[in-house]
C-alpha cells in the first residue's frame, strides 16, 4: 500500500469533466489491494440480483438499467427516473421456500431531473433453523422438547445519488454513488455490522450504451460479535466446538463492465442486447475465465420491447465447470450455465415483471419464479396533464 497515490492528488483532477479518471483510480486501487486477504464469498446475498427484469436478463444490467433498481445494479442509471418518484418491490423464494429474498427501493428525482436520490433495502432470510445444542440431556437421554428454532437474516440498506454530467443530442454521461450499511444476524448468537461504497458510470452514445460499476470499491467490512450463555458455552466446549469471540471480514472490490445496443426491428418492436463481465480480484474462481488474482464471469441478456407495453426477455450467466452426471469416479468435468427468461407488462404507470430462473445445472435444475412491481408515483397534476 506504500505505492498508493496521495490523497492530495485527487482534487487536482477534473473528475466532473473526465469521468474515465474514476475507472483509472479504481483499477490502480484494486491492483494494489488484490493481494490482501479477503473472504471470497463474503456478503453473497448482495449478488442475487434485484428486479425480475434484471434476473430474467441474466443479470446483464450495468449498461442499460434506467429505473429504481439501478441502486443495486449501477447507481448511475437512477437518472432514468424522471419527473415522479418510483417504487420497486420484489419477492422471491429459493430452495422450496427455505430462503426468502425481498427487495424494495424508492427513488426521488429533483425538479430539474438532473439528480436522483434513492433508498434501497435488501433482505435474505432462512427461518426455522433447528438449535439442537440441548437435544441431549446430561444423563445421555434425548429430549426433543429442548429443540428451539431461530432465524438467520441478512440486511442491506443502500443510499444512492446519481447525477447527469453531460447531456447532448448524441452523448449522455451519468455518474452515481452508493453508501451501503449491512446488518447480519444469526439468531441471538451472532450479529454483524458493515459498511461499503459503490460507484458507477453510464455513457450513452447513439444506439450504444456503456456502463461500469465498481462494487465495494473501498472494500466492504463486516464486524461480527457473538453472544452465548454460560450453559451454551459449556455445551460447545464439551462437544469440542470453538467458542468465537469477535471476528471481521472484508469483501474485495468487484468491477462490472457492460455494453448494450438498441436495434430497431420494426416501427413498434425494438431489441436490446447487453453483455456484462464481472471482474473479481480475490483469487481464482470457478468462472469462464479463471486466473489469479483476476477472474471474469460473463453475462448475456436480451429484451424485446413491443410498443413499450409488452416485454420478452432472456439471459444466460454463471458459466462454470462441474462434475459430469453419472461419473462415479468424479473425474470428468463439464461446462454448465444458468439460463433465465421472463416477461413484462406495462399499464399506465404500473409495470409488472416476471422472471423464470434456473439455480442449478441443466440435468437437475431448481427453478425459481420471481415477480416484481414497478410503480411510477404520478401526482394529481401530472395525471390531469395526461
Question: What residue spans do the PLM features occupy?
Answer:
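Cleavable N-terminal export/targeting peptides
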Residues: 1-42, 378-386
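Subset of outer-membrane beta-barrel
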Residues: 37-386
Amino acid at each position: 500500500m506504500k505505492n498508493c497515490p496521495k490523497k492530495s492528488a485527487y482534487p487536482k483532477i477534473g473528475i466532473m469533466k473526465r469521468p474515465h479518471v474514476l475507472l483509472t483510480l479504481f483499477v490502480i486501487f484494486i491492483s494494489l489491494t488484490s493481494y490482501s486477504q479477503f473472504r471470497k464469498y463474503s456478503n453473497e446475498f448482495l449478488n442475487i440480483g434485484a428486479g425480475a427484469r434484471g434476473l430474467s436478463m441474466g443479470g446483464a444490467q450495468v449498461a442499460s438499467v434506467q429505473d429504481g433498481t439501478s441502486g443495486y445494479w449501477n447507481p448511475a442509471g437512477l437518472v432514468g427516473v424522471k419527473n415522479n418518484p418510483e417504487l420497486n418491490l420484489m419477492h422471491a423464494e429459493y430452495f422450496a421456500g427455505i430462503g426468502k429474498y425481498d427487495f424494495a427501493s424508492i427513488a426521488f428525482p429533483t425538479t430539474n431531473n438532473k439528480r436522483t436520490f434513492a433508498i434501497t433495502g435488501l433482505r435474505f432470510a432462512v427461518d426455522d433453523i433447528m438449535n439442537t445444542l440441548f437435544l441431549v440431556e446430561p444423563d445421555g437421554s434425548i429430549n426433543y422438547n429442548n429443540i428451539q428454532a431461530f432465524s438467520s437474516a441478512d440486511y442491506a440498506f443502500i443510499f444512492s445519488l446519481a447525477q447527469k454530467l453531460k447531456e447532448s443530442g448524441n452523448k449522455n454521461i451519468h455518474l452515481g454513488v452508493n453508501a451501503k450499511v449491512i446488518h447480519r444476524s444469526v439468531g441471538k448468537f451472532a450479529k454483524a455490522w458493515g459498511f461499503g461504497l459503490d460507484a458507477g458510470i453510464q455513457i450513452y452514445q447513439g444506439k450504444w450504451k456503456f456502463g461500469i460499476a465498481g462494487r465495494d470499491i473501498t472494500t466492504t467490512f463486516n464486524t461480527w460479535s457473538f453472544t452465548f450463555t454460560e450453559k451454551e458455552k459449556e455445551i460447545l466446549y464439551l462437544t469440542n466446538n470453538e467458542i468465537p469471540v469477535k471476528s471481521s471480514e472484508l469483501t474485495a472490490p468487484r468491477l462490472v463492465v457492460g455494453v448494450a445496443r438498441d436495434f430497431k426491428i420494426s416501427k413498434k418492436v425494438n431489441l436490446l442486447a447487453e453483455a456484462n463481465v464481472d471482474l473479481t480480484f480475490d483469487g481464482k474462481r470457478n468462472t469462464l475465465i479463471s486466473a489469479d488474482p483476476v477472474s471474469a464471469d460473463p453475462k448475456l441478456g436480451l429484451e424485446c420491447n413491443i410498443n413499450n407495453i409488452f416485454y420478452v426477455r432472456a439471459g444466460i450467466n454463471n458459466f462454470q465447470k462441474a462434475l459430469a452426471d453419472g461419473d462415479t469416479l468424479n473425474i470428468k468435468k463439464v461446462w454448465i450455465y444458468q439460463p433465465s427468461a421472463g416477461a413484462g407488462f406495462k399499464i399506465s404507470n404500473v409495470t409488472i415483471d416476471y422472471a423464470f430462473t434456473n439455480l442449478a445445472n441443466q440435468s437437475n435444475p431448481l427453478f425459481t419464479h420471481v415477480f416484481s412491481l414497478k410503480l411510477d408515483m404520478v401526482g394529481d397534476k401530472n395525471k390531469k396533464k395526461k
